[in-house]
């Protein structure tokens, strides 16, 4: 249960946490509370991302309020749910090791954790991916027998997919990759060595830049909160400039920082290793510079791991620098890049059903049209599960259409997903039951 835990936690200030009294409904919940009730009075990780209502802190087996399509601070990828996706036909995924120095420093955490050093947490997550693979193997008959297989080459991925298993690509999405900040002295030789080291660990997918400016370049501006956090992490605010048509978000606009010299060196090294380079958190200037380097390197394909699209959104403080423009998509398509559609959308003007499969379809069809049409376009979905974002909301029930009453009433008369349903070639599926909770896509969303 998420109410409390027996892990050795300390507070965000490294002080002792009080021992809790477990509720009668969960008699053995643990000794220390992970977080409060998601109210504004609680720590930033509990309240800052909108996980409401109060009393949503019970996890397994009750699941009284989370996970939901809008919950952002809780585990959304329990292994049985991942298995269901595989059984339903998913055959390739990226498993990203992720951490955020600012969020780590704002939350209860394991004793001894140094939030200023991100890579040890990344190492632990990569090791855990291999341990998870071994654990599944042990449940399936021994080494290599499980349905979850970490792959390191396209040929390996194809072989795994052909035998009906899930091919898993390991990746890293972190704000301070290799510990390289603007204020330290990482060298090209050090960075090249780190790329080699993580390549040997099986990593093939890299975000050179994430939420903050760093040693490799400028971050896309899309959230005012991150500007304040950038001061804490990098010691300086973002410096922005107007970029009409790309960002309407007031003073946020676009980052003046592109790739640093070290960043350009990293991009070249990643291309030489044949790794996936994800541009999705880069500033527009860094994106342009990375595309230019890719063209110089024989039209090297790039990656958009959780795509949002500028033209899908109306102007008026809804578009921002992390959204891909039509011009960027044209260049990415010419390189043979992979561009995903994020399961969170920020569309605020849909006339039918906000933040639902309707708006996801709108973004998906736009991506297909820009990337070669339905005959050739292969569009992944970018879930960003556990990435402090929402997902595809429900079309029916109390919270449908992002609580838009008129849309909810109109949608109620439209056909629903009928359970059980059959996916040709993959079998028959009823509602997902986990613990004491039965999930229904119609009323729960993704």
Predicted regions and their residues:
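Short catalytic-loop micro-motif centered on adjacent basic/acidic residues
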Residues: 276-279
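N-terminal hydrophobic targeting/anchoring segments and the immediately downstream early-domain regions
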Residues: 1-253, 261-268, 272, 287, ...
């Amino acid at each position: 249960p998420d109410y409390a835990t027996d892990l050795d936690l300390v507070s965000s200030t490294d002080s002792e946490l009080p021992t809790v009294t477990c509720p009668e409904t969960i008699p053995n919940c643990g000794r220390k509370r992970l977080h409060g009730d998601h109210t504004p009075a609680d720590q930033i990780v509990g309240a800052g991302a909108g996980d409401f209502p109060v009393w949503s802190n019970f996890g397994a087996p009750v699941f009284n309020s989370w996970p939901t399509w809008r919950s952002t601070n809780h585990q959304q990828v329990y292994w049985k749910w991942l298995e269901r996706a595989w059984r339903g036909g998913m055959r390739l995924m990226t498993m990203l090791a992720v951490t955020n120095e600012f969020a780590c420093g704002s939350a209860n955490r394991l004793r001894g954790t140094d939030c200023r050093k991100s890579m040890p947490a990344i190492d632990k997550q990569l090791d855990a991916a291999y341990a998870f693979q071994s654990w599944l193997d042990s449940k399936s008959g021994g080494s290599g027998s499980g349905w979850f297989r970490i792959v390191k080459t396209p040929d390996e991925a194809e072989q795994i997919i052909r035998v009906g298993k899930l091919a898993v690509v390991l990746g890293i999405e972190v704000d301070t990759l290799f510990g390289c900040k603007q204020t330290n002295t990482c060298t090209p030789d050090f960075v090249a060595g780190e790329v080699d080291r993580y390549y040997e660990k099986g990593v093939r997918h890299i975000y050179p830049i994430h939420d903050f400016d760093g040693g490799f370049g400028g971050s896309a501006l899309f959230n005012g909160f991150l500007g304040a956090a950038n001061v804490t992490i990098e010691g300086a605010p973002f410096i922005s400039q107007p970029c009409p048509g790309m960002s309407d978000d007031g003073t946020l606009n676009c980052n003046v920082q592109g790739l640093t010299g070290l960043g350009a060196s990293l991009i070249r090294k990643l291309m030489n290793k044949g790794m996936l380079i994800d541009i999705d958190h880069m500033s527009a200037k860094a994106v342009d510079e990375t595309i230019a380097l890719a063209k110089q390197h024989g039209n090297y394909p790039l990656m958009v791991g959780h795509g949002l699209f500028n033209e899908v959104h109306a102007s008026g403080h809804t578009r921002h620098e992390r959204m891909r423009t039509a011009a960027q998509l044209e260049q990415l398509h010419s390189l043979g890049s992979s561009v995903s559609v994020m399961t969170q959308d920020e569309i605020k003007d849909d006339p039918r059903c906000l933040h639902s499969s309707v708006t996801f379809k709108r973004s998906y069809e736009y991506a297909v049209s820009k990337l070669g049409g339905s005959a050739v376009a292969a569009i992944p979905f970018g879930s960003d599960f556990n990435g402090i974002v929402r997902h595809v909301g429900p079309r029916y029930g109390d919270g449908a259409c992002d609580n838009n009453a008129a849309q909810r009433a109109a949608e109620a008369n439209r056909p629903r997903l009928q359970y059980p349903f059959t996916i040709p070639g993959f079998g028959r599926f009823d509602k997902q039951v986990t613990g004491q909770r039965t999930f229904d896509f119609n009323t729960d969303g993704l």
